[in-house]
């Protein structure tokens, strides 16, 4: 669906942000991208819908060159992006006005705009906030409004750039559940974060460091890789605990490291068995 070919990009001071990135994002997959601050993951995310253009190489979105300025509108119909701070995306005085902004720019008829707004409000469970100011909502609710706004454009791929980093744990969980449901309905998801705890549900994970992809694979392999600490990343606590238990011949299955409750249930089952 999206292909990056030898993509390189430098900051204005000449510091490399991306160096020779080659990557294929498959339709319908959930791709997690992790790395410490300054690793290049956000810069990579911005290249996926043309908000950044490569200084070398190409980004191809369903056969369209995302670096071609004349094709940007087509690219952004396919790939939508939600940022860390939702307020940067708010335009309207009310939630429904904000959601209508994108479809209006596509010059869609009013009946189609109304359908898309209503559908997005229902999808993200925001109907009761329809007439509220988006800026009056909590951080988690605001992030859901930003997500709903992108959904009105009906993109095939959704890019989430550190969307839970400014949220409390409960709000972050709400947003992650919404994203998971969208993936289950067929959306392609690209999710950047420095919090490895959030990527258990991904199909594939990339680890970035200093503008390069240094590790890639399925979550089970990447999240337990001993090199993560050398890259400034903290492995998920339950996976670390499972690794410690393994040394004592207590095997916790990968599926049961996804949440404290499932981990505890598996541990109890193993002890009762003995």
From Swiss-Prot:
Binding-site positions, ATP: 35-42
Membrane topology: Peripheral membrane protein
CDD domains reported in the protein's UniProt record: ABC_cobalt_CbiO_domain1
Location(s) in or outside the cell: Cell membrane
UniProt KW Coiled coil keyword: no
SMART domains listed in its UniProt record: AAA
Disulfide pattern: none
Database matches in PROSITE patterns: ABC_TRANSPORTER_2
Keywords for this protein: ATP-binding, Cell membrane, Membrane, Nucleotide-binding, Translocase, Transport
Family as reported in the entry's similarity comment: Belongs to the ABC transporter superfamily.
Name of protein: Putative ABC transporter ATP-binding protein MM_1037
Record organism: Methanosarcina mazei (strain ATCC BAA-159 / DSM 3647 / Goe1 / Go1 / JCM 11833 / OCM 88)
């Amino acid at each position: 669906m999206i292909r990056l070919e030898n993509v390189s990009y430098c900051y204005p001071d000449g510091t490399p942000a991306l160096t020779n990135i080659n990557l294929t994002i498959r339709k319908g997959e959930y791709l997690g991208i992790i790395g410490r601050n300054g690793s290049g993951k956000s810069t990579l995310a911005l290249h996926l819908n043309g908000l950044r253009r490569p200084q070398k190489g190409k980004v191809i979105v369903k056969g369209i060159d995302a670096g071609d300025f004349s094709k940007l509108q087509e690219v952004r119909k396919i790939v939508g992006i939600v940022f860390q701070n939702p307020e940067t995306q708010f335009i309207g005085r009310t939630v429904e006005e904000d959601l209508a902004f994108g479809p209006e720019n596509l010059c869609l008829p009013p009946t189609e705009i109304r359908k898309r707004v209503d559908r997005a409000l229902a999808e993200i469970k925001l109907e009761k906030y329809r007439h509220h100011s988006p800026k009056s909502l909590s951080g988690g609710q605001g992030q859901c409004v930003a997500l709903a706004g992108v959904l009105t454009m009906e993109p095939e791929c959704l890019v989430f750039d550190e969307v839970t980093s400014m949220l409390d744990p409960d709000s972050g969980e709400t947003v992650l559940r919404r994203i998971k449901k969208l993936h289950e309905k067929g959306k392609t998801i690209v999710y950047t974060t420095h919090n490895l705890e959030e990527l258990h549900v991904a199909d594939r994970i990339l680890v970035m460091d200093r503008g390069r992809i240094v590790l890639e694979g399925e979550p089970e392999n990447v999240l337990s890789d001993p090199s993560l600490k050398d890259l400034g990343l903290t492995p998920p606590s339950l996976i670390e605990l499972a690794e410690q238990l393994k040394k004592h011949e207590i095997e916790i299955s990968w599926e049961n490291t996804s949440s404290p409750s499932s981990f505890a249930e598996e541990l109890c089952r193993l002890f009762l068995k003995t």
